[in-house]
From Swiss-Prot:
Function recorded in the entry: ATP-dependent serine protease that mediates the selective degradation of mutant and abnormal proteins as well as certain short-lived regulatory proteins. Required for cellular homeostasis and for survival from DNA damage and developmental changes induced by stress. Degrades polypeptides processively to yield small peptide fragments that are 5 to 10 amino acids long. Binds to DNA in a double-stranded, site-specific manner.
Gene this chain is encoded by: lon
Name by which UniProt lists this protein: Lon protease
Signal peptide from the UniProt entry: none
Organism: Chlamydia muridarum (strain MoPn / Nigg)
UniProt-annotated location(s): Cytoplasm
Compositionally biased spans, kind Polar residues: 1-14
Higher taxonomy: Bacteria, Pseudomonadati, Chlamydiota, Chlamydiia, Chlamydiales
EC number per UniProt: 3.4.21.53
Keywords for this protein: ATP-binding, Cytoplasm, Hydrolase, Nucleotide-binding, Protease, Serine protease, Stress response
Length: 819
């Protein structure tokens, strides 16, 4: 059964004859008593939310179900009384409730009227009469119980009368603050003569927002003084709450009123200014702003014609129209482009070289190219735009060198990444017909830098994508072509913009994924990975001082021993760049900062100083991440060490060969190690070449007769490809065939042809760095790469014995000196 107290229907499945029998028993008991005596046995209706109080009329919503039937029968009988009792728990399941889940004190109510409602439910009007106490359950199924009635002591004392006056006073105050029950309160107060303080207390408490437990406590209080005390406490709480709500409402109304007043005053002021000619309309304000910008710019005539047409159009449009907003935004972009504004060029070579050396260690090729650019600008009385592509592993300083170039040239710097970009509109802008259209990144760069000759860095150009929206790489062709970018056309502006004075710097990790037409427009400068000595210098001169400053530390607080930095580089940060090294330095300094603060809190007068050594480095960084790059301290039979390079830098590449009996009875070769197509072809070339030149290198020996040769490239989870492992594969097979190990500490790289010729390869610097890291001091490079090797700095070549070869015969003599 549901009511205004959210009472649910009980799962009773009523039997009409059983209920009628119970009613007859109650009627017989009533006949033996006086007509005005209330029934001693009542059906109990559980309530969930709030209890009712005597002296009130209350509506109750009853849904179709067992209790509806019971109440209907009660209404037709002479008894017409029912008990209303609160459940102990608000979420009690009233479908299967027992007397032990009900409070003992409730109220009796007379059924005045039952009004059916559509859907089978009904509205029951009850007159709440007396407090009752459940004395003894009579019938559990229908919650019928024997009850005792509480009769009020109607003796009125002066103290009770004073209490009553206090209650009425608080109710009147509530009436002023909360008009929700205004009519009911006025009727009650008009008929109140203060002769029944108990009824007054019950009525006042019923109007509050007190909790069900607080209300039940008042209902169970039979002593008049205690009940009125509790009622006064609840009323005062309600009064405080109403005052707070009233204060909040007044503040809100005051704010709204103030805002409305300001709005009306502003509108009046605007009207007065218009009448006096002091206020301009929106058209005039916008046009004045655009003209002010144009006066500071040297706008080409073709662009000025478009701007003038749009300004004429703007004057004819209503400011509230959507077309006005589109036209105004278009003019905003057209006039904010820094037409004719360029940064003054500086050609001080010494200062430029000083800035570059201060910001970066090494990178001599890059620094030389920037100095050449400045020199050309000085001689030509002006520096045209250039397109430079910096290629190298992550963390070697490609982005930071771009910022340094902008600083050297005294130009603004703008950077954006095209990694994963699939929409050409990001480059060339959206057409104005689209909602939310805006120019592309290049026009945005001009707006943000406010000059026509900024340094624009386009990052991650090797990771650019394409989709049905277009091909951003193709869109870049126009941008990066010196013959075309002076007439660059953005789709949104639809006006030619001169980008020929912009210095474009592109960055990439590898060149393989860059389309050839795009690559053809760039001047490629390679940034190789750093060796131990270079990383040590970078850490000492740049990373440690910068990180100390960020952490609020100084050289007096913490210092790194050079050996500690070497240990960190070799065992925790072995990547080609210095990004991980920088993070590890910061990690150490954060832990040092924590210790310093902890020591200061314990002993403020004591100054802490920490020295990072190889011994205590593990306390800050944990166990070393890397071990030696070398798989073998002494090279076994069938193993040759190659040199490779990836987007992450150089690496050693071991080629392992073993032979097992062939199931087919023929010589066969099998390659594993996630090799790519080109590397698979290299293994076939090595196999065929060795077979054809067997008498030259292993006279009298059969070529793996009845054996299957398994060639494996370790670290099988890493994809590998490229032709530069050709001579290494032949050397591994020869070592297996001759049963002779390859010269220890030998590393090699080179592409092999079927005739034994050794061709040039790429990544000489990276491979040299990998060889030094693995302590390989004898190296074999193709003769075609001698020039690349000669251009390397001396400190990279120090302590290495390098052989340049043109044919595999030369490789054989070096790899197998005793054969």
């Amino acid at each position: 059964m549901n009511s205004t107290n959210n009472t649910d229907s009980q799962n009773l499945d009523p039997n009409a004859s059983e209920v009628e029998k119970l009613l007859d028993e109650s009627a017989e008991a009533e006949e033996k008593t006086d007509d005005h005596t209330p029934p001693s046995e009542l059906f109990i209706l559980p309530l969930n939310k709030r209890p009712f109080f005597p002296g009130m009329a209350a509506p109750l919503l009853i849904e179709a179900g067992p209790h509806y039937e019971v109440l209907t029968l009660l209404a037709k009988s002479s008894q017409k009384h029912i008990g209303l009792v609160l459940t102990k728990k608000e979420d009690a399941n009233t479908l299967k409730i027992g007397f032990n889940q009900l409070h003992r004190v409730g109220v009796s109510a007379r059924i005045l009227r039952i009004m059916p409602i559509e859907g089978g439910s009904a509205q029951v009007l009850l007159s709440i009469e007396d407090r009752i106490r459940i004395v003894k359950p009579v019938q559990d199924k229908y919650l019928k119980a024997k009850v005792a009635y509480h009769k009020e002591n109607k003796e009125l004392t002066e103290e009770l009368k004073a209490y009553s006056i206090s209650i009425v006073s608080i109710i009147k105050d509530l009436l002023k603050l909360n008009p929700l029950f205004k009519e009911e309160l006025q009727i009650f107060l008009g008929h109140s003569d203060f002769t029944e303080p108990g009824k007054l207390a019950d009525f006042s408490v019923a109007l509050t927002t007190a909790t069900r437990e607080e209300l039940q406590e008042v209902l169970e209080t039979t002593d008049m003084h205690d009940r009125i005390d509790k009622a006064l406490v609840l009323l005062k709480k309600e009064l405080d709450l109403s005052r707070l709500q009233s204060s909040i409402n007044q503040k809100i109304e005051a704010t709204i009123t103030k805002s409305q007043k300001e709005f009306f005053l502003k509108e009046q002021l605007k009207t007065i200014k218009k009448e006096l000619g002091l206020e301009k309309d929106d058209h005039a304000v916008d046009l004045e702003k655009f003209m002010e910008r144009l006066n500071k710019r040297d706008v080409p005539q073709y662009a000025m014609d478009v701007i003038q047409d749009e300004m004429d159009k703007l004057q004819t449009l209503e400011t509230s129209s959507a077309e006005y907003a589109v036209c105004r935004n278009y003019l905003d972009w057209l006039t904010i482009v820094p037409w004719g504004i360029q940064t003054k060029e500086y050609h001080d070579l010494k200062k430029a070289e000083s800035i570059l050396n201060k910001d970066h260690y090494g990178l001599e090729d890059i620094k030389q190219r920037i100095l050449e650019l400045i020199s050309v600008g000085k001689l030509a009385n002006g520096m045209k735009g250039s397109i430079i592509c910096l290629v190298g592993p992550p963390g070697v300083g490609k982005t930071s060198i771009g910022r340094s170039i902008a600083k050297v040239l005294h130009r603004k710097f703008f950077r954006f990444s095209v990694g994963g970009m699939r929409d050409e509109a990001e480059i060339k802008g959206h057409r104005r017909t689209y909602i939310g259209a805006m120019p592309g990144k290049l026009v945005q760069a001009l707006k943000q830098s406010a000059i026509m000759n900024p340094v624009i860095m386009i990052d991650e150009v090797d990771k650019i994508g394409s989709s049905y929206h277009g091909d951003p790489a193709s869109a870049l062709l126009e941008v990066l072509d010196p013959e075309q970018n002076k007439d660059f056309l953005d789709h949104y502006l639809d006006v030619r913009v001169d980008l020929s004075n912009v210095l474009f710097i592109l960055t990439a990790n590898v060149l393989d994924s860059i389309p050839d037409p795009l690559l053809d427009r760039m001047e490629v400068l390679r940034l190789s990975g750093y060796i131990l000595e270079e990383k040590l210098q970078i850490a000492t001169k740049y990373l440690v001082p910068r990180a100390r400053k960020e952490m609020g530390l100084s050289a007096q607080n913490v210092s790194f021993q050079p050996e500690a930095l070497k240990h960190m580089i070799n065992n925790y940060a072995r990547e080609a760049g210095v990004r991980t090294l920088n993070e590890n330095i910061k990690k150490v300094l954060r832990k040092v900062a924590l210790k310093i603060v902890q020591n200061q809190e314990k002993n403020p007068s004591k100054k802490s100083r920490f020295t990072i050594t190889p011994k205590n480095l593990q306390d800050y960084l944990g166990k070393p991440i890397f071990s030696s790059d070398r798989f073998y301290e002494k090279t076994p039979v069938g193993v040759a060490t190659g040199l490779a390079w990836t987007s992450l830098g150089g690496a050693t590449l071991y080629i392992e060969s073993v032979q097992v009996p062939s199931s087919s009875g023929k010589a066969d070769m099998h390659l594993t190690g996630q090799a790519g197509d080109v590397m698979k072809e290299s293994s076939q070339i090595a196999w065929t070449y060795l077979h054809s030149a067997l008498e030259r290198y292993a006279p009298g020996r059969p070529f793996f007769e009845k054996s299957q040769v398994h060639i494996h490239i370790p670290e099988g989870a890493t994809p590998k490809d490229g032709p530069s492992a050709g001579i290494t594969m032949v050397t591994s097979l020869l070592s297996l065939l001759l049963d002779v190990p390859v010269l220890n500490n030998l590393g090699m790289t080179g592409e092999l042809t079927l005739t034994g010729r050794v061709l040039g390869i790429g990544g000489i610097r990276e491979k040299l760095i990998a060889a030094r890291r693995s302590k390989l001091n004898v190296l074999i490079f193709p003769e075609d790469n001698r020039r690349d090797y000669d251009e390397l700095p001396a400190y990279l070549k120090k302590g290495l014995k390098v052989h340049f070869v043109t044919h595999y015969d030369d490789v054989f003599k070096i790899a197998f000196p005793g054969v």
